[in-house]
Amino acid sequence: DRRQRQMCIRDSAGTGHWPDADMLPVGPIRQVYDVNNWTNFTQDEQITMLTLWSIMRSPLMLGGELTGFDEFTMNLVTNSEILAMHANARHSHQVWRREIDGIEHALWIAADTKGGYYVAVFNLGDKDSDISIPLADLEIYDGVNGTELWSGEHVEEPKSLSVSLKSHGARAYHFTYN
């Protein structure tokens, strides 16, 4: 499974090198524009890919035909907050990968060169999930505010991070100390 292979390359990042998770097959993947030529990844899976590539700082090489992008795909690849994470994340690593309520999840964090921390939560299972993550798991502590990078939703001084995830979905956050 491609997601599992990419989760395993987490140790490839370091000074002067980073993991290359390969191209992002988004939007129309051939120049013949019909429904049969679009990526087979769901919108949630595409968000998961962009989130993982960005927190790892893997090169963002698109494997779709840019001139045929729909609004979702264009917003996906031009999200300024996700692109900032891609540019500024450092020391990214998987904190844990575990089963919660019968569904496998992964938690990644990275420092932000401009201050604060990036957090990405992934649902690796085939069912939607709602989980709660203690701040200590995020390797950050009290006195933080955050923003979910895909929705813009604000998270103010949480004691834990409550996350609703679609099957194969992801959420990305930026936290700063007050």
Residue ranges: model-predicted function:
Residues 53-56, 61-63, 100-140:
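Carbohydrate-binding surface patches
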Residues 1-9:
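Single conserved hydrophobic/aromatic residue that forms the stacking wall/gate
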Residues 157-178:
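C-terminal beta-strand-rich structural cap/linker in extracellular carbohydrate-active enzymes
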